[in-house]
């Protein structure tokens, strides 16, 4: 029986990826469709992807598939053909190609079965996720941005919005997508007669959000086809003005793709213009925050003097302090509340 999971250490896999000479292409895709047996589908797809040396993160559920991966360029067409023939629902699926890509976005393939491909918190049995808003292509997006009757809604997290967004887009202040959905309905009640345009990174969140808005009585709802990634690519190809300002945050080693030259965010430590995210180098913290090169040098890649001091301790002492620590379960926490408490950043919602 073939091995259907990774057995090599992360450090070894990352070193192997960094030593690769063959270029890779970073791709994201999703599809809402019914998967009768997610585990069986996962196991079959895992064998297809490993045979093609695909790295990345793939989630499957009864409601569909969500993937962010990298593929060796020499195997890209074979990958496309095998994906399209794997299931009729995937035939011709749009693949979002990364806008800025050094091919070093992933170093291991992780494929998991989940309850949902996007954690939405929806338990309403009458909700029809297929009743989505209409797609908008790049030219349509620009036209809507000039329409005074249109309202753009950013369905991404606070740390994504902070470094880049469409002109005058509304942020839904929440730490998770499941928190955003009811807040979006509440915030947009006063705009119920407007044209609601929803967007996210690659389309998966705003597609479901558009269906949720329609479920809650909003009739004029659109969402951007392929999200920010597809919009920027098509706008550039068609010679259209790119109306997204700043950087597009991505969930891999790159942590962002430059869309425009503007830097609209600031270093969370000194306030200098900066839009480069990093994780605190103290493994007992690992806070996601924005740090300029000067502060990275001053704090040794840490978010605070406390973390800097802890990082300087012997490794054994660091492990002892991490063991059983109250906030040990906050590793990888990206919440606005934790960011504000550690770095004294004012909450824009207050």
From Swiss-Prot:
Q: Which residues form the active site?
A: 200 (cysteine persulfide intermediate)
List every stretch annotated Disordered.
319-350
Please state every residue range assigned to the domain named Rhodanese: 146-240
Q: Which Gene3D superfamilies match?
A: 3.30.70.100, Rhodanese-like domain
Query: What name appears for this protein in its UniProt entry?
Result: tRNA uridine(34) hydroxylase
Xref: SUPFAM superfamilies: Rhodanese/Cell cycle control phosphatase (SSF52821)
Q: Could you tell me one molecular function GO term of this UniProt entry?
A: oxidoreductase activity, acting on paired donors, with incorporation or reduction of molecular oxygen
Q: What lineage does UniProt assign to this protein's organism? A: Bacteria, Pseudomonadati, Pseudomonadota, Gammaproteobacteria, Enterobacterales
Does the keyword section mention Protein transport?
no
Q: What is its EC number?
A: 1.14.-.-
| Keyword set, alphabetical order | Oxidoreductase, tRNA processing
Q: Where is the composition biased (Basic and acidic residues)?
A: 319-328
HAMAP family the UniProt entry points to: TrhO
Gene Ontology biological process terms, A to Z: tRNA modification
Q: Please give the superkingdom of this protein's source.
A: Bacteria
Q: Which gene encodes it?
A: trhO
Q: Which family does it belong to?
A: Belongs to the TrhO family.
Fetch the Pfam families from UniProt: Rhodanese, Rhodanese_C, UPF0176_N
Tell me, in a sentence or two, what this protein's role is. Catalyzes oxygen-dependent 5-hydroxyuridine (ho5U) modification at position 34 in tRNAs.
**Catalytic activity, per the record?**
uridine(34) in tRNA + AH2 + O2 = 5-hydroxyuridine(34) in tRNA + A + H2O
Primary enzyme class? oxidoreductase
